[in-house]
Amino acid sequence: MANKKKDHREEAVELLKQDAKRILQLIKVQMDNLTLPQCPAYEEVLDTQMYGLSREINFATRLGLIEPEEGKNLISALEKELSTLHELSMSKK
C-alpha cells in the first residue's frame, strides 16, 4: 500500500509540474504574440492560471499526495520564472 501511495505521490507531483510548465508556456506565447505584461487581459490570464494551480496544489496537499512545503516551492519556482520572463520582455520593448 505504501508503494502505491508513493506512485500516486510521484504522479501528483509530475502533473503539478506539467501544469506549472503549461502556465509558463501560455504566458510566453501571450507575451510574445498578444499582449504586454501591463495589459489587463494578460494580468487576468496570469491570475486565473496561478489561482487554478494553487487550488490544485491545495487539493493534492489535502489528499496527502504532496507536502505543503513542496507545493509552496512549486509556486515559488513558477513565480520566479514568470518574473524573469517579465523582465526579459520589458527589456526588449
From Swiss-Prot:
Pfam families: DUF1507. InterPro entries: UPF0358, UPF0358_sf. It comes from the Bacteria. Belongs to the UPF0358 family. This is UPF0358 protein lwe1048. It comes from Listeria welshimeri serovar 6b (strain ATCC 35897 / DSM 20650 / CCUG 15529 / CIP 8149 / NCTC 11857 / SLCC 5334 / V8).
